[in-house]
Amino acid sequence: MFTIHETRPVRSYSGEKWFTNSSNKKRLAEDFKNKCGYCGDFDVYSGGYNVYHVEHFAPKEKFKELEFTYDNLLYSCPYCNLAKSNKWIGKTATESIVGDKGFVDPCTEEYDLHLGRDEEGSIIYKTSLGQYIYMELKLYLKRHKILYNLDKIRLKRNVLKEEIEKRKLKSQDFQDLEVIYNELGALFCNYYELIVEESPIYT
């Protein structure tokens, strides 16, 4: 079993408070490495930076004073952001969980206690609270597994490409690596076609 994020996102910005989503979004994208805080989807496969949202962990509709508080913000894909909307189980901004219902900040270690990935890349829940988050955020959508595997293939191809270039410079044989590189390219295209065939949002 794996964690949703290979590296847990950390909100590093602590400077001047910005009162626009656009200013906060730039810093969130850096802190979250351009991946959704909840599902880990890399924005490049879903329209890029402009398509992703600034998510308010404690909803701004209920806690207006936190609208531009950086520690309450996340970088989120539109699927997770729209699924969560202004859902909040507690009566205060700090009461995010009541019993086995509620949400966990993905920047905390606790998030990994409730949710993870199986060996095929699908998001899975580990606890009753994790199941609640899983269902509310629609983390069962196939796109999360597909995008996870797309990025794994991309990273493997990058490593192979570097090794191929090194062998070329040393006049060493590289055909074996080139075969694998091309096979991964075909696999990447197959996964990408699955995303194109995916149903529209919220189906």
Protein language model features and the residues they cover:
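Domain-level detector of nuclease and nuclease-like folds
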Residues: 85-160
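Short, charged surface segments at domain edges that flank catalytic/cofactor-binding sites
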Residues: 1-38, 63-67, 71
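Histidine-centered nuclease catalytic patch
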Residues: 41-73, 84-99
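Cys/His-coordinated zinc-binding microdomains
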Residues: 40, 78-81
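The −1 position to Zn-ligating cysteines in a subset of zinc-ribbon hairpins
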Residues: 35, 53, 76
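C-terminal, charged low-complexity interaction regions
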Residues: 132-203
